[in-house]
Amino acid sequence: MDAPRASAAKPPTGRKMKARAPPPPGKAATLHVHSDQKPPHDGALGSQQNLVRMKEALRASTMDVTVVLPSGLEKRSVLNGSHAMMDLLVELCLQNHLNPSHHALEIRSSETQQPLSFKPNTLIGTLNVHTVFLKEKVPEEKVKPGPPKVPEKSVRLVVNYLRTQKAVVRVSPEVPLQNILPVICAKCEVSPEHVVLLRDNIAGEELELSKSLNELGIKELYAWDNRRETFRKSSLGNDETDKEKKKFLGFFKVNKRSNSKGCLTTPNSPSMHSRSLTLGPSLSLGSISGVSVKSEMKKRRAPPPPGSGPPVQDKASEKVSLGSQIDLQKKKRRAPAPPPPQPPPPSPLIPNRTEDKEENRKSTMVSLPLGSGSHCSPDGAPQVLSEAEETVSVGSCFASEDTTEDSGVMSSPSDIVSLDSQQDSMKYKDKWATDQEDCSDQDLAGTPDLGPQKSPLWEKNGSENSHLRTEKAVTASNDEEDLLIAGEFRKTLAELDEDLEEMEDSYETDTSSLTSSIHGASNHCPQDAMIPHGDTDAIPVTFIGEVSDDPVDSGLFSNRNNNAGSFDSEGVASRRDSLAPLQAEHSQPHEKAREEVPALHPASHDVGKGIRVALSNISKDGNLMETAPRVTSFASNLHTDNLNAKVKDKVYGCADGERTQATERVNSQPVNEKDSNDKNAALAPTSWHQRGQNPGKSYRLKHGLTTYKIIPPKSEMRCYDRDVSLSTGAIKIDELGNLVSPHATGIRIISLSSSVPEAESQPIGKVREFWRCNSVEKHLGRPSESSARGPPSTPVPTQTQNPESRLQADPKPISPQQKSAHHEGRNPLGEGRNQPPTMGMGHVRVPAAHTTEVTFLKPQRRTSSQYVASAIAKRIGAPKVHADVVRPHGYAEKGYAGKAPVLAAPPVTVKDDRTSSPHSETQGWKDGAQWPCVTPPNNHGEDLAVGAPPRGEVIGPHRKLSTQDRPAAIHRSSCFSLVQSSQRDRVSVGQSCGFSGKQSTSSQEASSASEPRRAPDGTDPPPPHTSDTQACSRELVNGSVRAPGHGEPSHPPGGSGTESHILLEREEKPSVFSTDGNETDSIWPPSIFGPKKKFKPVVQRPVPKDTSLHSALMEAIHSAGGKDRLRKTAEHTGEGRPAKLSYTEAEGERSALLAAIRGHSGTCSLRKVASSASEELQSFRDAALSAQGSESPLLEDLGLLSPPAIPPPPPPPSQALSAPRTASRFSTGTLSNTADARQALMDAIRSGTGAARLRKVPLLV
């Protein structure tokens, strides 16, 4: 009793306590302390006794019961109350001859007459029994389980409905579709009357309802609700397009269609009638990152075949850049030109889809006039149409600048741009039927045809009164809105500055294209910087690509970037008239020409003056050498006045760079004046081409640039500089598997070439071949300084900077790589400064004997990246040269003070009698250190100016280094890079060399030029020098170059039979090559890969060994030399420093002996003890010494030699183990027999190294 209470009273121990045990049987459920009941053990006993008493009482009692037999016979019987029910059954069956197993008893109560439940052992007396029924048992038939039910096979059927929703139902694949159609309808919540089961929603194949899923072989179908989806289709377009306009086009504040019926009055055919057409969205939303366009049901028909155009225009078919479209989309334009004819009503089945397409299409309606009258007024507010044109032309520069960044191939202009672009092109599905749609299909799809969508500057190209064509477009009246939009666009440009710096570096030009196109570089300047109204000058134009073989009209240039219009004949005539004052200066020196061109037009800062200079020089004088500097300097002057902000600096820098390129392109055109006038008059009205004629490459849009590039129609091969990575941190591995530093190939220093005064005729084919083989470089940095710093150091078409040389050179068309060499982004200089002009291109001819026609080299393009380094080199500043450096060659660049020391360069004569007059110009780096000079490979074996006098001088032009002139933004790329290329690629490393005029006759070594290799002992192998590399080597400050970054690239000899001459420079070494310029003695005969030279062997000094006592001791210990290797130093050395004993005597004889034995040092360290044997040994030794008089002194000398100052190197292990130390020391090989060996051993014992430590002991008798 108390135990459960005690356990319950215990505090919890953290575990749940067990429940109480149930009370013992026979005890009441509730326990009361004061109850009168007995204890539990007594209660159990009492209950059993009560049961016994009850049985005895029942035995004594009898019961009168009525028994009903199975036959229905009732029978009265008296039963004993103590009988169990089972016993009663057995007795009754026995009495009635029945089987007890087949019968059962049923007892009914006397009061209720209901059957009573009982157990077989229940006593009859305990039951209130009145009647007992003896019934026969009914045999219960067991329900046998049937065969197992096989589950019905079912599959999951995917039901697509309402175009975008899905449901999954499990149905039988064996039943017909009409049986499962109710299940599908219930799942999709559609009415079966309107549902049509289709195989898919694209093909629309209707399924037969009588077939099952297995017969059709499908597990997915489309339930088309023809009632709901017809309505949904018609309303789908509006919702989606409205969302897209809110999401993307709302940023540009696109006008509604009602008030932006823009018209483009461009002629569709050679006829003079202008036709208005509506421009669609100029840029598909899909081409903007982050905006996805659903072009699900939008398809367009193919454009009609291109119309036949003039043959000249077929040759230079035009192409529009994506940039012209992004600007159209960014600028909201309303052009009040007459609205275009309305399209026919769309089909009733899809009523709203076409309108939606047109809603998207209407977003950037821009009026692009062809006629004149689009001037930029002096107050800076341009007329409306002018700005529209500026928008187009500026935009077109974006794409052409960027498009070749990563793509190796360019698609046709149909892939690139139609004013309704590829993703949005489906919007015009129902618009092509009308007459206007023919025009839009030609001009929108192939928008190269949009000719004079010109900037205000470009329109003034035509003539004095800005008359380009007879058509005039209606000008809009909302000038204020245009100004506002232009301001917003400049803001957008400001935000894109960072993108500009990264994206503008990847422009590449085609090498083998045939083009006579000219870019109207629209002035992307703020309105206040626009050109005054009265300016009649044209803008510099950019030609990229090869010159056509037949004369092309310089006035009539095909519009390749959708921004340059055709010139009519009177425009050309007036332009030529305006050129008259400039042509008188052709023979003037370079500096004079550069400064007089701006002086002629002091009031007008129009960049266009350069184009007139270029055109006049071509048509009148045919002089290719003259005009580029003037145009470039004038363009730079224009922009020095116009710069107001950093964004403008960047934009104009790009613009100037490409104007420079444009000018050179114009210079390269061999134009006949008469042909110009004739063709101009004939072709001016028809300078529109269809898209199909232009197989050019695709260009992606780029932001922030303001000049245009003519895209050559096709490219033979697209080659990349394997050394230059598009990602800054990429790991680059050259052909030999060497890791190339990713920072070593950024901006290159251009090797500036000078030309010999007499220039011989060089076929243009060789020029093209050389450039095609020689350049694959791509510029990665921002176009830093103009290529005006100097032409590339190319062996064949040498460009000179001397006016005399330029005038003497015959005008030859220059192949596109050379021209693109001058495509340096010219960043504007400070206010009031003149930028150094771009040098004209002269051809210094090489005799045919020295030229090798290499016809198997891969044609490759030359890009502007090869001239980036030239610009940097010019602005870096004068190098810091050590006093011992000899600078015998070339001209040095002008310092900041404008001084121009002119040095005579003795041309170096090479083995093959070729003479070159290199003018080396060392380029200083920011820290004053010399940077790498890589001499270019000359794949053709062509060399410079054989006709030059052997010791002739060529005086370089006076150039200003404008490091402080340039904005700080230009200095962001600060490393020169060596160009790595395989032998096959023929990279012109000369473009990357910072020394002007070095003409290389060697080929680029296959090993990466930018891989730093340091000679083992700090000694660089002298680099081989050809005639051109000697000039470079003498310019070196310390005789070896420092590769960009942290290594000296030195090329091991025998690199694939080709060599790249990389002059190593190190600050810590004295000038190794500074005084010696005659290192071309080992030049091998030239091959197609250029002359080969042997490297001089590198002489290495052995590393001086450490002679300290500790090192000697440790060496002896490690080599098991024992005590004979240890030496005792004098008390006072020659320097007066006290020296410690390097050996401490062992304490006892035993320890010394054991140490000697363990150290394998032989008997040299054993002590001499007095004994008869020792005396006998001494006598033997004396006799032997007297007999060998001549040998003994020698051995004595050997034994008595003083210890060496430097411990000898440890002996080989075999020698140390096989021979005693003494024998090895005294050269046992010289002893002939064992007697000599024994004598030598005894001598060593007595007078060897251990003789000093031997001590006398008293004689033991």
From Swiss-Prot:
S-S pairs: none
Biased composition (Basic and acidic residues): 353-362, 587-600, 1121-1138
Feature: compositional bias, Pro residues: 336-349, 1204-1214
Entry-annotated residues carrying Phosphothreonine: T447
Position of sequence motif KKRRAP 1: 298-303
Placement of sequence motif KKRRAP 2: 331-336
Gene Ontology biological process: actin filament network formation; actin filament polymerization; collateral sprouting in absence of injury; digestive tract development; embryonic axis specification; floor plate development; liver development; neural tube closure
Compartments reported by the entry: Cell membrane; Cytoplasm, Cytoskeleton; Cell projection, Ruffle; Cytoplasm
Pfam families documented for this protein: Cobl (PF09469), WH2 (PF02205)
GO CC terms in record: actin filament; axon; axonal growth cone; cell cortex; dendrite; dendritic growth cone; membrane; neuronal cell body
Lineage, opening ranks: Eukaryota, Metazoa, Chordata, Craniata, Vertebrata
Bias kind Polar residues: ranges: 260-273, 409-425, 509-520, 687-696, 796-805, 989-998, 1072-1081
Keywords: Actin-binding, Cell membrane, Cell projection, Cytoplasm, Cytoskeleton, Membrane, Phosphoprotein, Repeat
Domain WH2: 1109-1129, 1149-1169, 1237-1257
Species assigned in the record: Homo sapiens (Human)
Complexes and interactors: Identified in a complex composed of ACTA1, COBL, GSN AND TMSB4X. Interacts (via WH2 domains) with actin monomers. Interacts with both PACSIN1 and DBNL. Identified in a complex composed of COBL, PACSIN1 and WASL. Interacts with PACSIN1, PACSIN2 and PACSIN3.
Gene Ontology molecular function: any one: actin monomer binding
Protein name, per record: Protein cordon-bleu
Domain of life of the native organism: Eukaryota
Function: Plays an important role in the reorganization of the actin cytoskeleton. Regulates neuron morphogenesis and increases branching of axons and dendrites. Regulates dendrite branching in Purkinje cells. Binds to and sequesters actin monomers (G actin). Nucleates actin polymerization by assembling three actin monomers in cross-filament orientation and thereby promotes growth of actin filaments at the barbed end. Can also mediate actin depolymerization at barbed ends and severing of actin filaments. Promotes formation of cell ruffles.
Bilayer topology: Peripheral membrane protein
